[in-house]
């Protein structure tokens, strides 16, 4: 007998995130703030400290960038530091479609004085969280022999090898960063 299966996993529901206000506090933009109480995202190009439409230290150094704003994290990453204001869907963009492939084979036979069964299987899974997944291989051999009317013997052996790639949990988990990232911050672009 040979069996195979393929399945796909996706995040079923996502929370609704506000996509109107940029990171910051009390209406002021702060590129290092994790709160989303800054100015309207649509007004970032007019921000007095970071806006590409205004006179500030960045536009004095690099020239005006109409319709954009300066993002220090992008500059530190070696990317173009000027970004067009928009709301990002960081949580949706973070997750992958998970794929799981299962396959197995089984050979079994019953004889006059015994029986045997050999099963082989494998599972390869790529998780919905990037860099997570599992590879699993298993084998099972069962044999039984009737040596005489009153005496039988048997053997049963199992082998399983698993390699699991998982995300860290608790305080080091990535999910707090993904769900907590402000909508104005491009988590995937830095």
Where are these regions (language model features)?
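Residue-level detector of the transmembrane beta-barrel scaffold of outer-membrane proteins
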Residues: 115-119, 152-154
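Outer-membrane beta-barrel initiation region
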Residues: 93-98, 105-111
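Residue-level signature of outer-membrane beta-barrel architecture
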Residues: 109-111, 122, 145, 157
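Transmembrane beta-strand segments that form the barrel wall of outer-membrane beta-barrel proteins
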Residues: 120-126
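N-terminal periplasmic accessory domains that precede
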Residues: 1-4, 105
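Outer-membrane beta-barrel architecture
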Residues: 106-108, 119, 142
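Surface-exposed loop/interface segments of Gram-negative outer-membrane beta-barrel transport/assembly proteins
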Residues: 3-86, 97, 127-132, 138-190
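Short coil turns and loop connectors of transmembrane beta-barrels in diderm outer membranes
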Residues: 112-113, 149
